[in-house]
Each structure stands twice: as C-alpha cells, then as structure tokens.
C-alpha cells in the first residue's frame, strides 16, 4: 500500500500470528487494568514533515517479506494486510496525536494507496484497553457512545451529560487533503474533535476535589504574635543592606542577612532572643485578656419572625447594650412574642418586662444571651422577668410612631415589673434628637415623658396648672397605667406636701411613695410612680406598692429638673426659656446663658425647701 508523501514505503503484515487483524475474528488486546493514562494534548503544526507516511516509514524494517497475505482480510478489503503490532500502533498514535486517550481509537482518514481511490477512506480502530468493539465492517465507522466509553474506562462523565464538542488543536492529521469527501469523513472529524475534551473532563472528574478552606477573618483587636529573634535581626539589618545595594532583590537580601546572622556572636544573638521572650510574655498576657473579653461579649442571635403583622416603621439593624453591674447567674432570652423594651447602659441597672405590639411587625427580633459577669443584680431580683431588646434607633429616630402603634398586652396573671432606661446616647445623637443629661437626683424623680393614652384603661394623669403642676391620681384596682402628657412649653413641677411628705430614693428606679391610708387628692390607695428618663418612649405598667408608715395626709407634686422638649432641636433646661442651649462643659450643654443657670438653680432650691416644709406651700413664679 502506498502512503501519500511521494515515497514508496510499504508496510506489510502477513502470517497467522496476528489474528487480531482478521476481519472474521473479534479484536482482542491485552488489558491494561484499572490504570489511568493522562496523556496531554499534542498539537501538530501544519508541517509536511509530520505526515503519516514519514512516521510509518520508520516501521518499514519491521515488515515480513516472506509472509503471505491473509486471505480473509484481503477478501473483505482488497488490500494487503497491515502488520502493526499493538506497541507500535500505540507509539504511532502518540506521535500522530489523532487520539489522545489510551483506551480510545486511532483514525487514519487518508486514502491509503491507489487501490482505495474509489472507496471511502479507511479508518483503523485500534483499542488499547478491554474494549470489545470489533473492527469496522465494510467501510463503516465504528462509533462509541458515552455510556460504553464510561463503562470501559471505569469513569463517570458527569451523570450522562453530553459534553460540548471542543475544537481539536489540529484539524487534520496531515496537510495532504483526502481526495474523497463523504459523510463518514465529517463524522470522523466531529468525533475526533470531541475526544480530547471528553478525556480531559473524564480525568478531572476522576480526581477528588478538595473543598477550599475558608479562612476566618482576623479580628483587628486580636494581639499579634511576636516574631522570632532572627526576624528582629532581619528588620534591623534589612534597611542598611537595602541602602548599600538598592537594586538587591529580596532573595539576595535574605542570603546576606542569613550569613550575617550565622557570623553573629552568641551574646548578640541573646539580645534578640531576650527581646523575643519579653514579647512572647506580653503577647500571652494580651491574648488571655482578649479571650476573656471575647467570652464576656454578648452573643446576639437574629431570629426571623413570621411576616404576619404589618409593620409601619422599617426596622434598622438591631443594637442594644446591657451594662455589667454585679455578677449574677442567669441567662436572659426574650419571649417569642413580647418584643419591646429598651435596655440601655447609661443609667442605673433596671429590670424590665413589657409586651407591646409596636415592634411586632418588625422582621427581626434580637435575642441577647448574657454571661454571668454582665448581669446586673437588679435583673436577678426580678420575678422571673425576661427582657426583649428592640433597636434603639427605632425609638429615637421614629419618635412617637413606635408608641402610637403599641399597646400593652401583659396578662393579669403575669407578674410584670416595668422599669425604663434611657436610650443609647450614640443612637440619639445619630437621630438628631435632644440628648438631655439628667442632673444628679436631688430627691426628685426624673422628668416625665409624653405617651399617647388608650381610653380603655384607668390612668394616672398629670394635669398642668399655671404655676404648680399637681398630680391627680385615680384609684385603679391593682395596676396603674401611667400616661404622661407634656405640653409644648416646658414648665417646672414642684413638690408640695400638706402635713408630711416621705420621699424615698433607691438605687434602682427613683420613686415617690405615699401611704395607702392617706389618698393623694381623693385617692383611696397609694401607688408607686416610676418616671421615665427623658429619652425613653415607652408605656409603663407598675405594680401597686402600698406602704403603711406615714399617718398623715399629703399632696405630692412631682418636681422636674429638666423638662423634655419634643422638638428635635434641644432647648434650654430652665422653665419658660425657649432658647437653644450653648455648648459649655460647665453647664453640660443644657443652658443658654449664665442667667438661666442661676434662675434654674434658684427654682430647684426653692422646690427642695418647699418639700422640707410640711406646713407651707411655696409657689415659684
């Protein structure tokens, strides 16, 4: 047979010793086991020197001149049989690059010799593994589907997905075109283009993919590990070496430093080692403090709620802090459906438990899991109270919106003790609200805050009168709903008792207590009035705290040292002054002038004198 290329090179195969080239028998090759061959793609340049004829010409010496032709092969194909041992065919396949997998096929899509000029190109399939597909029959190409290919190779092609055909690096095995063009030739081209990409994907699928390790983000507050003595020496000498050799690379500098370190004396090395030991001790101390701080921090968990109730106010990211007061063994988690009380760390430690539907429409509810060291003592003294924290920015920035959409839903069976705390100062400043600093308590409760009142519950209302402001209290059965109304012009509230007045100040909420036997303005019972801080907007339900100590009647008028302005712009604390306060450290940014400071101090002093005097009522103009 003649190969294209101009030289008459013939390769003959004769004799019965090669039954695998017989058309009547099945093609068997030695099994290579389960080994996988990873043969990289070999792209051929368009060079005539790499033609098949030149490659096959090297095998001319291996031909058997005395052998006779195989009758069965000649009868079917009308050509001399080819003597291509399997090893040679494999080598030819690797050089030709037609098929790159050890267990696939090799095609020679040229017209081989003049005897084949009238026939379609002969394709010889030489399987290299245990594939049982025989030779092609009567000029037809033997095709291998994906399932058969995967079963023979012992690999999976990704669940039967058909891979897209990829363009092979070479379009043809040789630059000499075939004189015949047919559908078989197109099929050979498509099949050969698919094989390199399929084999590559198969090999990759066989390997185990390692899951990428996720690196934890470093905390900037975490102390840094100390460096070694050599690293300290490297830092000291690197700048000097760079100054002498500006063009030196990092590797060259490292070599110079290493040689200098080796030649360094033991005493000089000990200096750097002592520095390292000291740095290690400092690092261990800082690391222990850092870990303790991490353990003490509250773990905040966000629980998604069912979006059943509509929300009128969008919920900003939750923020809440609880100040550490004294260690107490407890853990606080909010009830699933009681979402609103503001817990803050600016005033004394209060414990609170209030249910409100105002924040129920928000998509998030914040759970605080607080360690023993962070719990204030007043929390453990509560009667099983649970604290739900809502974002502080909702209270400050939304103003009365939260209060108007909220109603108290505490059941009578619940033992509810409601104590309020001031809102975070940072959130109040961000919301441009007036952050009023409370003066130290001088036997008067903190200022009162405005809240809307539902008409269904009994209330204690503070009515405003021209000079004094007296508290008119109605007799509720057991619990008192306090609704505090404040008029736009801030007024001074004074305490005016009739015979005697018993004022009690406690460390937790400041209260004004009275006797249950002597009513306050026709009130048959006495109640504990807990006043909110100026920045807190919430409704309170307080338990009745009777006290049988004072035998005489009395009228109680609450004294407010700093009335709260509802406008977002802060005003002077003095009663009746509408001017904005001036920034001053001495006044705590609460007064507009020295005159207002003097007048306000006089008013507070006169109110205190009035509370001491049991027989006279002092009115301050």
UniProtKB/Swiss-Prot annotation:
Residues 307-319 have a biased composition (Pro residues). Residues 153-227, 305-333, 510-529 are annotated as: Disordered. This is TOX high mobility group box family member 4. Residues 208-218 have a biased composition (Basic residues). Residues 223-291 bind DNA. Transcription factor that modulates cell fate reprogramming from the somatic state to the pluripotent and neuronal fate. In liver, controls the expression of hormone-regulated gluconeogenic genes such as G6PC1 and PCK1. This regulation is independent of the insulin receptor activation. Also acts as a regulatory component of protein phosphatase 1 (PP1) complexes. Component of the PNUTS-PP1 protein phosphatase complex, a PP1 complex that regulates RNA polymerase II transcription pause-release. It is found in: Nucleus; Chromosome. The lineage of its organism: Eukaryota, Metazoa, Chordata, Craniata, Vertebrata. Residues 320-333 have a biased composition (Low complexity). The gene is TOX4. InterPro entries: HMG_box_dom (IPR009071), HMG_box_dom_sf (IPR036910), TOX_HMG-box_domain (IPR051365). Keywords: Chromosome, DNA-binding, Methylation, Nucleus, Phosphoprotein, Transcription, Transcription regulation. It comes from Pongo abelii.
């Amino acid at each position: 047979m003649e190969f294209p290329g101009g030289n008459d090179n013939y390769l003959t195969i004769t004799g019965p010793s090669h039954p695998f080239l017989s058309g009547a028998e099945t093609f068997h090759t030695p099994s290579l086991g389960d080994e996988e061959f990873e043969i990289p793609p070999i792209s051929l340049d368009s060079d005539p020197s790499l033609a098949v004829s030149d490659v096959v010409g090297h095998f001319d010496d291996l031909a058997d001149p005395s052998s006779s032709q195989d009758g069965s092969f000649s009868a079917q194909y009308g050509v001399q049989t080819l003597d291509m041992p399997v090893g040679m065919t494999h080598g030819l396949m690797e050089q030709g690059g037609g098929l790159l997998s050890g267990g696939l096929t090799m095609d020679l899509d040229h017209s081989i010799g003049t005897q084949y000029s009238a026939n379609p190109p002969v394709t010889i399939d030489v399987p290299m593994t245990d594939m049982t597909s025989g030779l092609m029959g009567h000029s037809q190409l033997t095709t291998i589907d994906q399932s058969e290919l995967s079963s023979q190779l012992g690999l999976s092609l990704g669940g039967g997905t058909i891979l897209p055909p990829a363009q092979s690096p070479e379009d043809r095995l040789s630059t000499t075109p075939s004189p015949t063009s047919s559908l078989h030739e197109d099929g050979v081209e498509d099949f050969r283009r698919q094989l390199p990409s399929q084999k590559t994907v198969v090999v990759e699928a066989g390997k185990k993919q390692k899951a990428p390790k996720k690196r934890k983000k470093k905390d900037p507050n975490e102390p840094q590990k100390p460096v070694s003595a050599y690293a300290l020496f490297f830092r000291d000498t690197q700048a000097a070496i760079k100054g002498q050799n500006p063009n030196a690379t990092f590797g060259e500098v490292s070599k110079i430093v290493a040689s200098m370190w080796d030649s360094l004396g033991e005493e000089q090395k000990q200096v750097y080692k002592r520095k390292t030991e000291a740095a290690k001790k400092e690092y261990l101390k800082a690391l222990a403090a850092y870990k303790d701080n991490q353990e003490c921090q509250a773990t905040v968990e966000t629980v998604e709620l069912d979006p059943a109730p509509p929300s009128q106010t969008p919920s900003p990211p939750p923020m809440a802090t609880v100040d550490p007061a004294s260690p107490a063994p407890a853990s606080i988690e909010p009830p699933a459906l009681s979402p609103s009380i503001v817990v803050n760390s600016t005033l004394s430690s209060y414990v609170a438990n209030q249910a409100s539907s105002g924040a129920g429409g928000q998509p998030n509810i914040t759970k605080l899991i607080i360690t023993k060291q962070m719990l204030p003592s007043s929390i453990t003294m509560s009667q099983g109270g649970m604290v739900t924290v809502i974002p502080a920015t909702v209270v400050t920035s939304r103003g009365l919106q939260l209060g108007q959409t909220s109603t108290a839903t505490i059941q009578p069976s619940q033992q509810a003790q409601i104590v309020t705390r001031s809102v975070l100062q940072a959130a109040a400043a961000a919301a441009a609200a007036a952050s009023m600093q409370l003066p130290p308590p001088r036997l008067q409760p903190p200022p009162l805050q405005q809240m809307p009142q539902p008409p269904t519950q009994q209330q204690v209302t503070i009515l405003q009168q021209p000079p004094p402001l007296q508290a008119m209290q109605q007799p509720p059965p057991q619990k008192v709903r306090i609704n505090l109304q404040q008029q736009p012009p801030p007024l001074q509230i004074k305490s005016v008792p009739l015979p005697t007045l018993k004022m009690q100040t406690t460390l937790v909420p400041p209260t004004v207590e009275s006797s249950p036997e002597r009513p306050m303005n026709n009130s048959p019972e006495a109640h504990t009035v807990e006043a909110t801080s100026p920045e807190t907007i919430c409704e309170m339900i307080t338990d009745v705290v009777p006290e049988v100590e004072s035998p005489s009647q009395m009228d109680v008028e609450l004294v407010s040292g700093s009335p709260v302005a509802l406008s977002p712009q802060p005003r002077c604390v003095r009663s009746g002054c509408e001017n904005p306060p001036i920034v001053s450290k001495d006044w705590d940014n609460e007064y507009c002038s020295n005159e207002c400071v003097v007048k306000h101090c006089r008013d507070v002093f006169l109110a205190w004198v009035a509370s001491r005097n049991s027989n006279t009522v002092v009115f301050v103009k």
